[in-house]
Amino acid sequence: MGRAYQNRKESMAKTAGQKTRLYSRYGKEIYVVAKQGGVEPDGNLSLRRLIERAKKDQVPAHVIERAIDKAKGGGGEDYDTARYEGFGPGNCMVIVDCLTDNVKRTFTEVRQAFVKNDAKLGTPGTVGHMFDQSAVFVFPGEDEDAILEILMMADVDVNDVEVEDGMISVIAPHTEFFKVKTALTDAMPDINFEVENITFVPQTMTPVSGEDVAVFDKFIAALEDCDDVQNVYHNAEIQD
């Protein structure tokens, strides 16, 4: 699959435990974004984008509303952001973003996930420079030239448009997120985005094959089992 697919997360959690973690992560992130930038989505574009993504991932409305109400009340928990970088199985590059009320606990849990799965935790900036923060949209389609023309006519800055397996991926600077979405939805009102997100896109991919594949899957699962982990980005290209 293309780069966008390599970094997208499952849009629906499959088990009750995964759903609980998904709801908790969205609730925490919505609370932090609303507390920092305001509780009205029209005036807080980061909150608006986050709510749209939560709805697409089928997060219940009451989870979203409770997080916003909590932010309205002031006080509450204070969360710090924490980012960890390093190399995973097969020497792939990994970025782990966290929201935590206890940095020491989070570091310990993330480090254990690295240590137990043939991965190496690096220092800040170890691999971050090899990823670009980008707006990524993925939707059904075959005609990449038509999509590129739509975006050019709307004066949208685009990094890449690619087609693979009947899906079009649009990658643009993260600052162009709403311009891309508006241009596409205006031109194609019935468009259905499978992915619409701001994420870290790797500049190069690292093949992961053989025995490293199972270790890599275990490594990612261990990271995502950490309650404070919000997102995991990597450049692994799994070789079947």
Curated annotation (Swiss-Prot):
Cited InterPro entries: Integrase-like_N, TACO1_YebC-like_2nd/3rd_dom, TACO1_YebC_N, Transcrip_reg_TACO1-like, Transcrip_reg_TACO1-like_dom3, YebC-like
Subcellular location(s) per record: Cytoplasm
A cellular component annotation (GO) from this entry: cytosol
An example molecular function term from Gene Ontology annotations: DNA binding
Entry superkingdom: Bacteria
Keyword terms of this UniProt record: Cytoplasm, DNA-binding, Transcription, Transcription regulation
Gene3D superfamilies assigned to the protein according to its UniProt record, in alphabetical order: 1.10.10.200, 3.30.70.980
One of the GO BP terms on file: regulation of DNA-templated transcription
Major subcellular site: cytoplasm
Entries under Pfam families matching the protein: TACO1_YebC_N, Transcrip_reg
Family to which this protein belongs: Belongs to the TACO1 family.
Protein name according to UniProt: Probable transcriptional regulatory protein SO_3401
Species, as recorded: Shewanella oneidensis (strain ATCC 700550 / JCM 31522 / CIP 106686 / LMG 19005 / NCIMB 14063 / MR-1)
